Amino acid sequence: DYLHLTGREQTHIDFIESYCKMIGIFRTDDDQDPKFSKSLELDLNTITPAISGPLNPEERVTLEEAEERAIEFQEAHISNRSKTAEIKSSKFEYNGQETTLTDGNIVIAAITSCTNTSNPSVLIGAGLLAKKAIEKGLMTQPHIKTSFAPGSLVVTKYMKNLGLDQYLDMLGFHTVGYGCTTCIGNSGPLPIEIDQVIRDDDLYVTSILSGNRNFAGRVHQLTRGNFLASPMLVVAYALAGRTDINITNHVFGIDQDEKEIHLKDIWPSQKEILDAINSGLNPEMY
């Protein structure tokens, strides 16, 4: 199915099938269960969503625990700060408006080409989440530099075909290129005003990206905490504006019915994602 979907020629598909059968790795539902030297039992109820950070890729932390982890590193920086040992809020003018930047704020949010962009489900999921957020009146914070760098032109084709690109654009996740960008430090400079206030007040600011490396200084020299997440969570955290929160119960805003907007209210269902994949992708795109 994957080879058909991605536009491979039938002769190539037949060759792959014949080769896999010849070396014994082509399986059907009618085959006998293979015998394994070892087996592993896993309780699926123990699987929980997670992000990684703030300093290394192996620092996995569940969404519920992420707030405590982020605050721990944030407070360590604040306690060593010479100017003040309290959480700092800095006001400055940006794009003609008074803006506030505080310790813990996100200043870079990027859906990157690393790892995730070969998987349509998470990118379409990010687009659907953006659509739901816009429909509820949510916007990303003005102090965040947002970007979208797919790993393939095909991504742009199916996002446009589904009409989801416009919602990512509205949240600032414009397509900036194809290939390595923010994940290897190629985010470019932060706006001068934001760069200056971070330096002047020694603020603890962070980044969130869908890459696979988050070592100190790799994403940007001024982001002291860097978190790795799925494209959907990158959009969600950008809407929240900070990493020192429990994103699962964070209140993003108030809707038209004066009800609190939570992550579950903008998170697309698996059916919505699968329906979009089935209607939005075709072999001709490849």
Short names for language-model regions:
Residues 1-19, 23-27, 122-124, 130-142, ...:
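Mobile "lid/hinge" segments at catalytic clefts and subdomain interfaces of large enzymes
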Residues 166-173:
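Glycine-rich and small/hydrophobic secondary-structure elements
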Residues 38-40, 104-107, 172, 204-206:
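A generic secondary-structure signal marking the coil-to-beta-strand transition
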Residues 115, 168, 235:
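Hydrophobic, well-ordered secondary-structure elements that form the walls
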Residues 36, 40-46, 207, 211-214:
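Self-splicing inteins and homing endonuclease
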Residues 40-163:
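Non-catalytic terminal/interface segments that mediate subunit docking, oligomerization
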Residues 24-26, 32, 114:
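Noncatalytic alpha-helical scaffolds and linker/capping helices
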